[in-house]
Swiss-Prot record:
Heme 1 (or BL or b562) is low-potential and absorbs at about 562 nm, and heme 2 (or BH or b566) is high-potential and absorbs at about 566 nm. The gene is MT-CYB. The lineage of its organism: Eukaryota, Metazoa, Chordata, Craniata, Vertebrata. The cytochrome bc1 complex contains 3 respiratory subunits (MT-CYB, CYC1 and UQCRFS1), 2 core proteins (UQCRC1 and UQCRC2) and probably 6 low-molecular weight proteins. Pfam families: Cytochrom_B_C, Cytochrome_B. Component of the ubiquinol-cytochrome c reductase complex (complex III or cytochrome b-c1 complex) that is part of the mitochondrial respiratory chain. The b-c1 complex mediates electron transfer from ubiquinol to cytochrome c. Contributes to the generation of a proton gradient across the mitochondrial membrane that is then used for ATP synthesis. Keywords: Electron transport, Heme, Iron, Membrane, Metal-binding, Mitochondrion, Mitochondrion inner membrane, Respiratory chain, Transmembrane, Transmembrane helix, Transport, Ubiquinone. It comes from Lycodon semicarinatus (Ryukyu odd-tooth snake). Heme b b562 binds at H75, H174. GO terms for molecular function: metal ion binding; ubiquinol-cytochrome-c reductase activity. Gene3D superfamilies: Cytochrome Bc1 Complex, Chain C (1.20.810.10). This is Cytochrome b.
Length: 372
């Protein structure tokens, strides 16, 4: 009987009738999370967290373990799919004013930080050339912290350089953090259901709600099928599309790659980091590139929640999307003109969105309500 009540609660959950496909990305993220946890568990069974054996153990998984190549490729492609979904999920939140549900937005931003940390630790685990050098560059940023920077870095490394203790603790963190993500996701969903979802119009949905099942469950199943089909097509035809050639060589501390870069989903933050020719300034900008999302609920000035009827803000939003893509592209290029200038200009544009948004909201209020 209690199970039936739980099922009824899920089935009869009232949801606004006009929410679009952009609201399906939450369930897609939940599926990605489940997929990553399952594939990650099976990979962890065969992985060895040792600097001499890590690279060989990954090769062993793909070559010798039954269906190991599926697990390894699904885990790698799943990470990229996770970030594609989360960036679209955040973009939808910015466009439709979902950030005004403060608790949900703030818990979601904390989730993003933990997710990025988890993905970074996971990128180091294969102990390839790019894994090692990306870890060296990014962890070295801690030395920019005044007074305690060097101590913090040595504490994280477990010594005076990246070595076996570093890999062991990164593996431990990469294993434990997904469970933190699952716990926080539960809180995120619980907080969402106390107030309910917004909708494309930004109005109150109470006047027109429909049951979650069958309407939205069928919508969810459709997008999940598309996502999983895409993942399997990539896995079978071009499994290494998101990988860098340098990472197919074992880590060598004596040979520095020509161009050090993290995975594609961190390139926007990496582009902002390297556009500032100062270590501390770059590190602060790197953290702010994500932390600035925390400010949006407190800087909203428009009388309208959604951007649906706000053409000026829409223009600024699509500029932000173009800026995000341009920073990502520029960060893949060497640190030389014109890429440094492009990186600096796009970084400036990226942060200007969060300054212009409240100003444009105020201006649109003036224009819209002049004659009322």
């Amino acid at each position: 009987m209690p199970n039936q009540h739980m099922l009824m609660l899920f089935n009869m959950l009232p949801v606004g009738s006009n929410i679009s496909t952009w609201w399906n990305f939450g369930s897609m993220l939940l599926t990605c999370s489940a997929l990553q946890t399952i594939t990650g568990f099976f990979l962890a069974i065969h992985y060895t967290a040792n600097i001499n054996l890590a690279f060989s153990s990954v090769i062993h998984i793909t070559r010798d373990v039954p269906y190991g190549w599926i697990m390894q490729n699904l885990h790698a492609i799943g990470a990229s799919m996770f970030f594609i979904c989360i960036y679209i999920h955040i973009a939808r939140g910015l466009y439709y004013g979902s950030y005004l549900n403060k608790n949900v937005w703030l818990s979601g931003t904390i989730l993003l930080f933990i997710l990025m940390a988890t993905a970074f630790f996971g990128y180091v685990l294969p102990w390839g050339q790019m894994s090692f050098w990306a870890a060296t560059v990014i962890t070295n940023l801690l030395t920019a912290v005044p007074y305690i920077g060097t101590t913090l870095t040595n504490w994280l490394w477990g010594g005076f350089s990246i070595n076996d203790p570093t890999l062991t603790r990164f593996f431990a963190l990469h294993f434990i953090l997904p469970f933190t993500i699952i716990s926080l996701s539960s809180i995120h969903i619980m907080l969402l259901h106390t107030e309910g979802s917004s909708n494309p119009l930004g109005t109150n949905s109470d006047i027109d709600k429909i049951p979650f099942h069958p309407y939205h469950t069928h919508k969810d199943i459709l997008v999940l099928t598309i996502m999983l089909t895409t993942m399997f097509i990539i896995m079978t035809l071009t499994p290494n599309i998101f990988n860098y050639p340098e990472n197919f060589s074992k880590a060598n501390p004596l040979v520095t790659p020509q161009h050090i870069k993290p995975e594609w989903y961190f390139l926007f933050a990496y582009g902002i980091l390297r556009s500032i020719p100062n270590k501390l300034g770059g590190t602060v900008a790197l953290v702010l590139s994500v932390a600035i999302l925390l400010t949006t609920p407190f800087t909203h000035t428009s009388h309208m929640r959604s951007m649906t009827f706000r053409p000026l803000t829409q223009l600024m939003f699509w500029t932000l999307v173009a800026t995000f893509i341009t920073i990502t592209w520029a960060a893949t290029k060497p640190v030389e003109p014109p890429f440094t200038m492009i990186g600096q200009m796009t970084s400036l544009l990226y942060f200007s969105f969060f300054i212009m948004n409240p100003l444009l909201g105020w201006l649109e209020n003036k224009i819209s309500f002049t004659n009322t």
